Every structure is written in C-alpha cells, then in structure tokens.
Amino acid sequence: MRLITAYNPPASPARTRPADRAPLRVAAVQQSWHRDPAEHRAALMEGIRLAAGEGARVVCLQELTLSPYFAVLRKADHPAPAEPEDLATGPTFAFAAAAARAHGVYVHASLYEKAPAPDGGDDGLGYNTAILVAPDGTLAQRTRKTHIPLTEGYYEDQWFRQGPADDAFPLVKVDEANLGLPTCWDQWFPELARAYSLAGADILVYPTAIGSEPGHPGFDTQPLWQKVITGNAVANATFMVVPNRVGAENGLVFYGSSFIVDPYGRVLAQAPRDEPAVLVADLDLDARRDWLELFPFLTTRRPDAYAPLTATG
C-alpha cells in the first residue's frame, strides 16, 4: 500500500505570533472494496497499522467502510439489499474499536446505521453515519449525514434518511483540535462547512464514495469535487481530510484522489486515482486562527441578509 506523508507543515503566511497549539498528525486511508470480508478488513487494518506506525493520532476511513457502495442501485433493483447495522453492536463499530485499541489511535469509520424514523416508525431507511472511536475502544462521537444524494448511480435516498437538523453539527475534541464528522455529499454544501466553522471546528473529515457519473460517462467530476472542498476550507478556515474509495463496483468507477487540505487551500497530501494509499500529514492547528485574524469571515457575516438560505422550495 502506497504511503504518502507530509510532515513539518508549511508556514502559516498570516501568522503574527507563535502558535498556541501543537500540530496534530492525521491520516486518511484510501482503499477498494474486497468481496471477501476478511480480506477487506485486513486491507483496512493494514492501512491503519501503517498510519499508526507513522505517528498518526487520528486515522480516517472511507464512506460505508466495511460495505460495497450498494446505493449504486435502487433498493428495489438490488439483488442482495444491504441491511443496516446497530451502531453500538454492529460490525463497523466492532472493527473500528478493535483497530483503535490495537494501535492506540482514534479511528474514524462510516456505516449504514439501523435506527427508527424520527416518529418512531419504520420507513425502510437508516442513517449514513460517521463515527469516531477513541483509543480505548469507546465511541467518541457520531454524526448522521445531513444531505442525501438522489442522482443516477448514487440512489442514497432509497437507503438513507436525512440526518436530524437539530443534531447536524456535533464536534469532538481530540487533544487540542475540534473535529466535525460530516459525510460525502455534505461536502458540496457551503452552509454546512460554515455552520461547523461557526461551531469552532478546526478539521472536517468527509468519508467519501464518489466516482464516475453513469448518466454522463465522459464527465470527470474529480476536479470540481476537489475545488469545492478546497474552497470551503479557505472560506471557513478549516482543514479538510477526505478519504475516498477506489476501484469499480457495479459499473461505478471510484476516482480515489483522497486528499488533506489546509485553511489556505494548500493540498498537503493527495492519493492517486487508482490505487490504495495512506496519507499522513501534520496539521498546524493555529493556521485557522491566523487566517481568520487576517480575513475575519465569521465576524463580518450578515445573517440578517441571508433569509433566502432558509427558504424552502
């Protein structure tokens, strides 16, 4: 598995005083899905082992970590529909907890969570949920995906309901850093990144499953995907850690290109499009402070002028 590192973070060009916080070393594991569950877990565990061996404090895994990307098909058309799992007792948490304990790191993962609808009923849907497991194997935080795609090849509305609006932007503290745990399609919405930044997020982790467009086979969205995430990093003074998957599943070709970007829009580390990789980078956490002091986006906002953002329809 290819290892790509970015240590000794670049200087913060807006810095006027020494940093108050130590850098945080994070990792993103880019992997393909393996049909054999044991082989798949072993491949992911090897990525976690490599990252931990490089001193990563947090290791981030792709969307629907242990699963194929089953939303490439509508549920009614799927030959073997995936079943949601219990967050606390299911295989994803068990895997992440075992990896966290074995390697003494925080492990971030993603799962199809079994949970009742907000009204207590059964709507046939679950949540697309990101979790962070602490080194002692306990759940540090969980976040349900807020925005759900519904386009060809990404029929997530057939499988997942939207995450609750009143619990959309929780943070978790890792050492001196505040992390947010949104998921994939959330990365296209500037409102979400802004809400997390206002809450004090230093780092957003976006587990991702994105690749080709079945209805537009000649359209490569990878450059746009990276640009929008990078733009949101700059506009909100947050680091972005983005683990995507690679490989082909049911005609969908995932384009990898996992990356880690800083609040100045500088890509610290990037994976190739077509092979597994582990990215490990040091994040200068106070680059956020420096950039917001020079360009105070958060304190010069005009919420009184933003009514169209909350209009429906």
Where are these regions (language model features)?
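CN hydrolase (nitrilase-like) catalytic-core segments centered on the catalytic cysteine
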Residues: 85-108, 178, 184-277
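Cys-nucleophile CN-hydrolase/nitrilase-fold catalytic domain and related Cys-dependent amidase chemistry
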Residues: 37, 45-135, 142, 210-231, ...
